[in-house]
């Protein structure tokens, strides 16, 4: 299992990076989000795309959509600071059933402050759980954190952040993914994109409407490791429908 996870890590260390290692991009200076679309032809959607993420979630349509069907399985994890985020890669076994398709969790990572907003409210931290189906299509479950009580699962992750950038470490005490999520799994749904280059579209976004808590110290610790904000600015909705 460890070998399989290591191979997966090498092939796709981060959907945030998305095979963009040869082109420097980031959140500051000439590599910041305003410049992404011009850094490489592969990044053109960052500038020209019409279904980009993140968005400000507002005026959502109330609709009957299926409850989240999640399954969790304990397994091995690896944690890495890739310079853009703190990411936890997970072994197979955690699944999402959506639109009669099975998606498998690949990794989860964080942005501070939040990328998506809900009715104009920005949260201090947002987690993205990246799922992939057999055809390679992606679904992202987004989880908001509000300042409050310390989060035990974040504490588990933060204690194991590697000292060096791009250094992957086996997680000695795995993060309990189910325990990281709220008890209520109501969500907003819309079509969007990766929030990092190459900004690929066609991503199914499910943004949970109930935040969980993280302490001010935990939020500050993440920001200190990143040394800068790592959120892409809000993108135009361009007539997209949001359902809730």
Curated annotation (Swiss-Prot):
Its EC number is 4.2.1.1. Substrate binds at residues 195-196. The keyword Disulfide bond applies. Pfam families: Carb_anhydrase (PF00194). Its cofactor is Zn(2+). Disulfide bonds join 46-199. It catalyses: hydrogencarbonate + H(+) = CO2 + H2O. GO terms for molecular function: carbonate dehydratase activity; zinc ion binding. Its main location: periplasm. Gene3D superfamilies: Alpha carbonic anhydrase. Residues 23-244 form the Alpha-carbonic anhydrase domain. GO terms for cellular component: periplasmic space. The active site is at 84 (proton acceptor). PROSITE patterns: ALPHA_CA_1, ALPHA_CA_2. Keywords: Disulfide bond, Lyase, Metal-binding, Periplasm, Signal, Zinc. Coiled coil: none annotated. InterPro entries: Alpha_CA_prokaryot-like, CA_dom, CA_dom_sf, Carbonic_anhydrase_a-class, Carbonic_anhydrase_a-class_CS. Zn(2+) binds at residues 109, 111, 128. Reversible hydration of carbon dioxide. PANTHER family: CARBONIC ANHYDRASE. Belongs to the alpha-carbonic anhydrase family. This is Carbonic anhydrase. It comes from Pectobacterium carotovorum (Erwinia carotovora). The lineage of its organism: Bacteria, Pseudomonadati, Pseudomonadota, Gammaproteobacteria, Enterobacterales. The gene is cah.
């Amino acid at each position: 299992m460890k070998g399989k996870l290591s191979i997966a890590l090498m092939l796709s260390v981060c959907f945030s990076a998305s095979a963009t290692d040869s082109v420097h991009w980031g959140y500051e200076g000439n590599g910041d989000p305003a410049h992404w679309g011009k850094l490489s032809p592969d990044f053109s959607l960052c500038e020209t795309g019409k279904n980009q993420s993140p968005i400000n979630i507002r005026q959502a349509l109330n609709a009957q959509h299926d409850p989240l069907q999640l399954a969790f399985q304990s397994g091995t994890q690896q944690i890495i600071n890739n310079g853009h985020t703190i990411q936890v890669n997970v072994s197979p076994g955690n699944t999402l059933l959506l639109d009669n398709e099975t998606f498998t969790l690949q990794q989860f990572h964080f942005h501070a402050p939040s990328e998506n907003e809900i009715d104009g409210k920005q949260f201090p931290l947002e987690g993205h759980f990246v799922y992939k189906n057999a055809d390679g299509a992606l679904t992202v479950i987004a989880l908001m954190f509000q300042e409050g009580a310390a989060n035990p699962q974040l504490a588990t992750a933060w204690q194991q952040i590697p000292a060096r950038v791009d250094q992957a470490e086996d997680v000695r005490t795995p993060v309990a993914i189910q325990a990281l999520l709220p008890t209520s799994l109501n969500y907003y749904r819309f079509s969007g994109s990766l929030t990092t280059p190459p900004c690929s579209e066609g991503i199914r976004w499910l943004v949970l409407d109930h935040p969980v808590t993280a302490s001010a110290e935990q939020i500050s610790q993440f920001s200190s490791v990143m040394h800068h904000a790592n959120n892409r600015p809000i993108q135009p909705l361009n007539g997209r429908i949001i359902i809730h």
